[in-house]
Amino acid sequence: MMESLPTLLLATAYAPPVSYFVKLYEHIAGTIALEGCEHYIKQSYRNRCRILGPNGVQSLTIPVELPAGTKTPIREVRISDHGEWRHLHAQALRTAYGASPFFEFYADELMPFYERRYTYLWDFNAELLQTLLAQLQLDLDWSMTTGFLPPQSSEATSECCDLRYTLSPKLVAPVPGVQLRPYYQLHLERMGFVEDLSILDLLFEMGPEALLVLRDSLQA
């Protein structure tokens, strides 16, 4: 009998990196939980994604407001309208991927996220995640945690695949079980392959074949 997978525990993220979706693919038949009880963490994928523009890697950051400062629960983090970020992110995506093979194919589903106004970062990320899963044809269910599990607890280390703090733009360590497969990128010849960008990069460049890249990025 096949051994069941441990629960996959992830943080909420803005258009998460490819490795995040590789782990989702791996646990498609298992239990997946997104951390809903932590305090907000700065300089993380929770409100930041990385894309590849004509001048190199570019970070897109959603400005946020923290009603309780550093102790603000992740579900209470508010999106700030400071700096017209929606317009800037939409323009950055069009500049980076407007000439990519599948940008127009997905634009009608994804670009409206930069027109709607969301109050909470959690809600924006969750709805965008659902749309991304649908475009990838990745049929899975996830739930929100109901209590905080300390990362060093025995339960987190033995019963979970805990990647809440492993997947970070500040860490270069490989994600356990993931060996990212290179794929076509618009600026490949000039810049070489840049791995683990936002899933938007993979979708806009590879379209329906994105799911195959996720599959082939799992280490045996």
Language-model-detected regions and their locations in the chain:
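Residues lining hydrophobic/aromatic ligand-binding pockets adjacent to catalytic sites
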Residues: 2-220
